Amino acid sequence: MPRYAIYLIAVVCCLVGCRQKQPSFRVPAQAPPYAGLTAILVKTDTLWVEIVSDPASRAQGLMYRRELPKDEGMLFVFEYPQLLSFWMRNTYLPLDIAFVSPDRRIENILPMKPLDEGPRYESRGPALYAIEANQGWFARHGIKAGDSIQL
């Protein structure tokens, strides 16, 4: 009997030792779609944004782009709170813009028409940030004025 017990223990040890190990790394819950994007939380939803904070990048914005993936957008960062005004010159995409106060609350959200150089889309009050996303993104996620963002 002891001889069989030794063989049994040896077989069990071999089987345990041959077991495939699980990888030691974990895939992040939300990996960025591609380099250069940052996740921001708008209310409770993630939007991947390209951040533009210098005058030339802010002036360029999303001009000339033909597509914007589903949960992506652009975050405009300004030096100080001010009344902001945007237009859609050379912008082919229908967008929504959310103006965000210094305390990171959405002041107002406006739909913007592609290639429309006429109207200016303006913040209701002094804003430090503006977020552009595909038209309807804010509404689909139940986001409205007064909701907060986390950077």
Task: Describe these PLM feature segments.
Residues C14-G17:
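C-terminal motif of bacterial Sec signal peptides marking the signal peptidase cleavage site
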Residues M1-I6:
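Bacterial N-terminal signal peptides that target proteins for export
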Residues R19-L151:
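Compact, glycine-rich, soluble single-domain proteins
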